[in-house]
Design a protein with these regions (language model features):
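Residue-level detector of alpha-helix initiation sites
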Residues: 78, 144-146, 169, 276-278, ...
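N-terminal Rossmann-like FAD-binding beta1-loop-alpha1 element of flavoenzymes
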Residues: 137-162, 279-287
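Conserved hydrophobic helix-helix packing surfaces used for dimerization/oligomerization
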Residues: 138-140, 161, 270, 294, ...
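Rossmann-like dinucleotide-binding cores of NAD(P)H-dependent redox enzymes
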Residues: 160-163, 167-198, 202, 283-330, ...
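FAD-site-proximal beta/loop scaffold in flavoenzymes
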Residues: 242-267, 350-422
């Protein structure tokens, strides 16, 4: 990278990456909890993929029973602590709050959920216990939200669970792929310990398919769960991607999450390609690391931005500038990036009425920059799946399952991003739980 932004004072880094949603005080929590109407057949529960009994945990906060509140949360969602910080609550539980219909501010469910879960984790209070051993074993691939959701549910039913993870540090995107100002890695690792406290074994630094085979796992366990997530960031497949200064958004976010801020170089002028939630995390953090200019280049218009609205607004409030209807075609530079060659685009419709992006002839332009962060989605794990699980049925690169996580292979289950193509942490946990409730009756424990 030719032009690196000057390093900031440590105090500035800490201020820039401080918790974007600070913890409520006890008085604030009690006041906010009192606003809940404790609805019967509460729409907030239906809006939560893990179906946390939200009125119940909030009611317990009003009576000072934070331990019971946390138990209600963790029984439904083993990653309820993380989800309190990173869930898109505006689109889920808080968006469904009935107070919205009265044109009032919804109950800040996420903040209250954090109060309860922080209380028990800060004090080392155990609220969940493993079930009596039933003699059955389950192997899980990938130590992320889906596997945690599955393993925690199974452990409470008495199963011996062992998770295999390629990385040495478990946690999936919670640990490696979410902006540091939303949740620091140590917070995510507290929930990893919660999973371990149920007797779940996590073997890090073990690559399934290389260090141990799928056949070995299937022979040693009664069931196999795939929680492998997605692959690396998609390539743009344009010239110059190997230039110094062109980086993968997920790798960039991972470094910010797990290394000292001062160690991470960022360009003076940065361009982020793509406009999803990962793009926002990359762009805002580049700005907070000291980049003088950060622009997001997107081939469609503002009405098509895939990031959640509040994420989009956060980026703009941080000084990130959006450049719409612009498509990169080449990275320019002599060893190090100096500019991106782009073309303007327009959105048209084809004969079937589908909206299509078309390059405008003669509209070439160059955007000078020192750093380009590619955030255009992740690849699917098709190659790994087809190589190691012959006969596994896929749907557009995603593992095909039924409503309880069963794949086309007997004894093999799946959930999370490898199934849904990349959704939220809470969706992955929910799919892991659903698979556990499919595994249990399949292994001889029918539900009443």
């Amino acid at each position: 990278m030719k032009n690196v932004a000057p390093k900031l004072e440590d105090s500035v880094y800490e201020r820039n990456f401080a918790d974007i949603n600070p913890r409520l005080t006890e008085a604030q929590a009690l006041s906010e909890a009192a606003r809940c109407l404790f609805c019967y057949d509460a729409p907030c529960i239906a809006a939560c993929p893990t179906a946390i009994d939200i009125p119940s945990f909030i009611k317990k906060i009003t009576t000072g029973n934070l331990r019971g509140s946390a138990r209600t949360i963790f029984e439904a969602n083993i990653l309820g602590h993380s989800c309190a910080r990173v869930c898109p609550v505006e689109a889920l539980c808080e968006g469904a709050c009935v107070l919205n219909q009265e044109h009032k501010r919804p109950v800040t469910i996420g903040a209250l959920q954090r109060v309860a879960t922080d209380h028990v984790l800060d004090r080392g209070i155990r609220v969940l216990e493993a079930g009596s051993p039933n003699g059955r074993r389950v192997a899980l691939v990938g130590a992320g939200p889906a596997s945690f959701g599955c393993a925690a549910e199974l452990a409470r039913l008495g199963y011996a669970c062992r998770i295999y993870e390629r990385r040495t540090v478990p946690g999936g995107l919670n640990t490696h792929g979410i902006a540091a100002y939303k949740m620091r890695a140590p917070e995510a690792l507290r929930e990893v310990e919660l999973v371990r406290s149920l007797g779940v074994e996590i073997r890090g630094g073990v690559e399934v398919g290389k260090d141990v085979t799928i056949e070995q796992l299937r022979s040693e366990a009664n069931a196999l769960f795939l929680g492998i997530g997605l692959g690396p960031t998609e390539s743009l497949r344009i010239p110059g991607e190997n230039l110094s200064g062109v980086v993968d958004a997920l790798h960039f976010i991972d470094r910010i999450k797990n290394e000292p801020f001062r160690r991470i170089d960022v360009g003076r002028t940065v361009v982020v390609i793509g406009a999803g939630n990962t793009s926002v995390d990359a762009a805002t953090q580049a700005k907070r690391l000291g980049a003088e200019s950060v622009r997001v280049v997107y081939r469609r218009g503002p009405e098509d931005v895939p990031a959640y609205h509040y994420e989009y607004e956060l980026a703009k409030s941080d000084g990130v500038v959006y450049v719409f209807h612009t498509l990169p075609v080449r990275f320019l530079g002599d060893g190090a990036l100096t500019a991106i060659e782009c073309v303007r685009t327009e959105v048209t419709t084809d004969e079937k009425g589908r909206r299509m992006v078309r390059a405008v002839p003669g509209s070439e332009l160059r955007i000078p920059c020192d750093m380009a962060i590619v955030a255009v989605g992740q690849t699917k794990a098709v190659e790994w799946l087809t190589r190691h699980l012959s006969g596994l049925e896929l749907d557009r690169g995603r593992v095909k399952i039924d409503g309880e996580g069963r794949t086309s292979l007997k004894g093999v289950y799946a959930g999370g991003d490898c199934v849904n193509g990349g959704r939220e942490v809470v969706n992955a946990v929910a799919e892991g739980k659903a698979a556990a409730l499919g595994i249990d009756p399949d292994l001889g424990h029918p539900r009443a």
